[in-house]
Amino acid sequence: MDMKAMLKQAQKMQADLEKKQSELAKKEFNISKQGVEIVINGAKEITKLVIHPALIDEDDKETLEDLLILAFNEAISLISEEEAKIAPKANSLGF
């Protein structure tokens, strides 16, 4: 394969990757954990947070904090999995 063809292939792959990243940024992920619901987009921006009223207890805020951490971490993990699916494979360029 000559250099021009390799460069053209690399440019196409870059354009495809940018398109997929843009699509991922617009995608929404919904996570619900024991009364805590989070909606987060692929750009890792939280767009909605719902906390069931029963979880709001001034004497036990640690439980709510733990549930929020669990939900946030699961949301970020889902996005990372999607990012891994669209990441280019190093050997796909033929190197």
Curated annotation (Swiss-Prot):
GO terms for cellular component: bacterial nucleoid; cytosol. Keywords: Cytoplasm, DNA-binding. Homodimer. InterPro entries: YbaB-like_sf, YbaB/EbfC. Pfam families: YbaB_DNA_bd (PF02575). It is found in: Cytoplasm, Nucleoid. Its main location: cytoplasm. GO terms for molecular function: DNA binding. Belongs to the YbaB/EbfC family. It comes from Mycoplasma mobile (strain ATCC 43663 / 163K / NCTC 11711) (Mesomycoplasma mobile). Binds to DNA and alters its conformation. May be involved in regulation of gene expression, nucleoid organization and DNA protection. PANTHER family: NUCLEOID-ASSOCIATED PROTEIN YBAB. This is Nucleoid-associated protein MMOB0740.
